[in-house]
Amino acid sequence: MVQPGQHRATARVLLHNPQGEVFMLLTHFDPEVGLPPRWLTPGGGVDEGESVRDAAVRELREETGIVLNPDQLGEPVFHAIGRWDWTDGNHHTYEDTIFQLQVEGFEIDTSGWTADEHRDVVRYRWWNPTELLESGEAVAPHGLAEFLVRHLA
């Protein structure tokens, strides 16, 4: 769980299929701090002493069941630094690094999910980037939805 004032580095993987659709997870994140539900790519926090690339591979395995070697990921395609303001007046900052991986499709395996993920992930689906942008749904990090339209359209 993110603490008030904490800086959180995350590693994520932009999974897309040959049709250009993106696999996203809808999460409540942490209802206790009042952040709205939003769509995210698979990923999560970088552990102390862990590289961003290794964290992306670990998180992808935990959240989807996809097993990769770290060198199967190319260079990061999106990087965002920002701040989430909480409804109670607190906030936390973040730095997201997103890698890209094309997949033909897969059956998600949630057996690696933490208790928080089972509580917080509402659903998951493939999105057409333009439909995601035009849906009005919240997408994190800031600017990702616009990037997806430019990058995958």
Positions of the model-derived regions?
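Residues that scaffold the ATP/ADP-binding catalytic core of kinase and kinase-like folds
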Residues: L25, G49, L132-S135
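Active-site-adjacent beta-strand/loop module that shapes the phosphate/pyrophosphate-binding cleft
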Residues: Q19, F78-G112
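N-terminal strand-loop-strand
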Residues: M1-L40, R53
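Nudix hydrolase/Nudix homology domain
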Residues: E32, P37, G105-A153
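A structural microfeature
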Residues: M24, E75-F78
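The catalytic Nudix box helix
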Residues: T41-P76
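A generic structural micro-feature
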Residues: Q3-H7, L35-R38, G89-E95, D116-V121
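Conserved hydrophobic/aromatic beta-strand scaffold that supports enzyme active sites
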Residues: M24, I98-Q100, Y124-W126
